[in-house]
């Protein structure tokens, strides 16, 4: 991901309209250029005043310095947005290609089936109060779990390895889905990049 200060706003790995009709073009433009871009700018502005932190990676900042609000909110915002954008792909989700081998076996072992994973993940995402994210993560022993984090908190501070996330801040879906977060979550499953999720699991 984005390596160290000064952090750059990474381009989307697809066009703004590539996730239509599930996530609309205007939402992606505002989400990427305005919201994500603002976190990059605010993180760089803070780090400009902290030379001793400028050599740290995004992950190191989050894991070691999240007690600093400017790091927790802005480094978390950069990490979470990049992670979210990168686990989406245009067109119908590559569920057959990506869900094979180790990933499929691990999901079946820890959730029983893909349908049960989706059900539990969707329930958690819909249950986030206010703003935040829901994550599929791996423990150090390789077992999978679902966690939700408020605001721009990340699973990194919990010692977990994230492999999939959904952004449930209202700016991620409100222009298209209004107050129908459930419909947004349903649409999310159509654009998950399971190949990327499999790579993250390792």
Question: What spans do the regions from the language model cover?
Answer:
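Feature for soluble, non-membrane regions of globular proteins
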Residues: 1-202
């Amino acid at each position: 991901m984005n390596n160290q200060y000064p952090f750059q706003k990474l381009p989307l790995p697809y066009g703004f309209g590539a996730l239509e009709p599930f996530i609309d073009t205007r939402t992606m433009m505002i989400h990427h250029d305005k919201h994500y871009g603002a976190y990059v700018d605010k993180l760089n502005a803070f780090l400009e005043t902290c030379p001793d932190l400028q050599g740290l990676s995004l992950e190191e900042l989050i894991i070691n310095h999240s007690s600093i609000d400017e790091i927790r909110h802005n480094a978390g915002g950069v990490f979470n947005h990049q992670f979210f954008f990168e686990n989406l792909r245009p067109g119908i989700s590559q569920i057959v290609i990506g869900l094979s081998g180790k990933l499929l076996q691990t999901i079946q072992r820890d959730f029983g089936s893909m349908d049960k994973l989706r059900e539990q993940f969707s329930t958690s995402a819909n249950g986030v109060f206010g703003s935040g994210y829901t994550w599929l993560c791996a423990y150090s022993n390789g077992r999978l779990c679902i966690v939700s984090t408020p605001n721009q908190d990340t699973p990194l501070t919990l010692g977990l390895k994230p492999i999939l996330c959904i952004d449930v801040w209202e700016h991620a879906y409100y222009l298209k889905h209004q107050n129908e977060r459930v419909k947004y979550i349903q649409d999310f499953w159509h654009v998950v990049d399971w190949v990327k999720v499999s790579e993250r699991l390792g």
